[in-house]
Amino acid sequence: MQNPPENQGKLVRSIGLTSAVVLVISSVIGTGVFKKIAPMSYELQSPSLVLFAWLAAGLISLAGTLSNAEVASMLADSGGDFVYYRKIYNRFFAFLFGWTNFAVIRTASIASIAYVFAQSINSLIPIPNSSQELSDISIFGLHFFDNLGIKLIAIALIVFLTYFNNKGMKLGEKLSTTLVSLMVMAMLLIITLGLLSSSGSLEHLQQNSVRYNPESMSGSTLFKALALACLSAFWGYEGWNSVGYIGGEIKNPQRNLPLALTIGTLIIMALYLMMNFVYLYILPIDEFINIYEAKNGIGAVAVVKHFLGPWGGTLISCLILVTTFNCTSSTILLASRLFYAMAKDNMFFKKVDYIHPVY
């Protein structure tokens, strides 16, 4: 490994427990809690099973969190899972993990969350679309120019947040703290207003879909439906391990890193269960099945519009904007430490291991 240049900075352990918890929440809460109620309702056709799937996925994620936290406390360094793979297995598996994240996993996550951000803007302020002739152009079966306006907004967001987070961890941390505070307050407001709304009914939570057949929804069929629903829920929990990527910047990581992972995951579980309870309290499950089959709506938006009217739709759209903006920012910020660790270990482009002496 080459010696760093003289003007090379170094990573500083400046992230405390509270900030680490905020970053866990930031990197997890994105689109899943708003969009996945519809496909999960379609698969399970029962409110109680939908809530059970969210709980089961949360408990499995928590088990993963606790296992990861044990390793993170022993190997707290920049790079997170990459460092764990390298130490526990070997460089080859670490190499595969890192490049898979660069080529597919982190890249796709950032792109998909940014795209939902752009879609949310489009629902508030219509974005001009490309012409039909341009939209119909197909390259290897892919319509790159379809919804071009939305895609350009998503690209612009990624470029802006990459530049913004390039200015240092403290700036990204402050942004996440502000946005998480707004996000949690808005979610608690929706939960409170939903529970107090006269539009809701406990009967909605007790009534299965008109399509529900208790005889067929049992055994292997039930297991398959639960597995498919849990896949949707796991998308909502994805990203809890990302804070391990900044293990080299967390104060007292042997204590704070496991605590941040555990506390953050428990907070997310509680918010997800309460939000989905309100969804199913306000609307019967068949409404969510219809939303899924129509392919033209978001379950959370339909719920809030139902009990708060048009301004409720604006509120939930703004909340989705905040969460997707924040999740995109945190994913870009935290993933950069993975590629830094790879470059430092001569498994990635060498210039990526440069640390600005100021930022």
Where do the PLM segments sit?
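Hydrophobic transmembrane alpha-helices that form the core helical bundles
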Residues: 39-42, 54, 61-158, 163, ...
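Hydrophobic, membrane-embedded alpha-helices of multi-pass small-molecule transporters
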Residues: 15, 19-32, 153-160, 214-270, ...
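Selective recognition of specific alpha-helical transmembrane segments in multi-pass small-molecule
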Residues: 59-63, 182-197, 255-287
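Helix-loop junctions at the membrane interface of multi-pass solute transporters
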Residues: 38-40, 70-72, 82-88, 163, ...
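Membrane-interface "cap" regions at the ends of multi-pass membrane proteins
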Residues: 1-38, 42-51, 55, 61-66, ...
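Membrane-interface loop-to-helix entry segments
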Residues: 118, 149-207, 238, 261-265
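TM-loop-TM module centered on a large, flexible mid-protein loop between adjacent transmembrane helices
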Residues: 83-84, 90, 122-132, 211-216, ...
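Hydrophobic, small-residue-rich membrane helices and short re-entrant helix-turn-helix hairpins
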Residues: 7-11, 167-177, 238-271, 343-354, ...
